Amino acid sequence: MIDPRGNVQGSYDKVHLFNAVVNGTTFRASDVESAGDHLVIADINGVKVGLSICFDIRFPEMFRQMARAGAQVILVPAAFTRTTGKAHWEVLVRARAIENQAYVVASATIASEDATVSGFETWGHAMVAGPWGMCWQIWARSITASGLLSWIWPRWTRCERSCLCFIPVDLRFTSVSPGTFRVIACGLQGLDVKALR
């Protein structure tokens, strides 16, 4: 994570490695990567920003931990396959935003250009989802760039040919703001699970 002045504020190693079979194709990230062992929240100009990577989005408890630690914005750079992206991408991004009362900024690599290198086509469809379920989507499927970058900026909404987008973010709607719909504060922790027979 690099702040607006170019200073490194922190780094994150993906905790959940993608070991799966999708449409007959086997992915074993653990063969070439090592999993991280902690979560990261950086303070960027007074905004608490949580870091995650791709497959991490499928683990809601990770996002809840960051929200409980004060994350207002959570970044998710990703390369979902076309199959999993079409079925799950938007649902997961919006769910993590709503259930944790945070903005989720989900950049995504685009389509066929990656297929020649990685052997699979990626879904693309970068988006920003807000705490009330609002969603700004960038439906890029034919751009020849290898990725799409989403940035948040407090006052402007503008998407230009350069694929740089500015999305309005109102941090008053996040879980750490007084007077908001306080789902995080109302949640129960440490309940025992009772098995029924």
Label each residue range with its predicted role.
Residues 1, 11, 39-41, 106, ...:
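Conserved hydrophobic/aromatic beta-strand scaffold that supports enzyme active sites
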Residues 1-69, 82-91, 95, 162:
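Active-site catalytic loop in hydrolytic enzyme cores
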Residues 7-10, 25-26, 34-38, 67, ...:
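Glycine-rich loops and low-complexity Gly/Arg-rich segments
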Residues 18-22, 29-32, 83-84, 105-107, ...:
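A short linear-motif detector with a strong N-terminal bias
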Residues 48, 57-147:
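CN hydrolase (nitrilase-like) catalytic-core segments centered on the catalytic cysteine
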Residues 109-195:
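C-terminal beta-strand edge segments of enzyme domains
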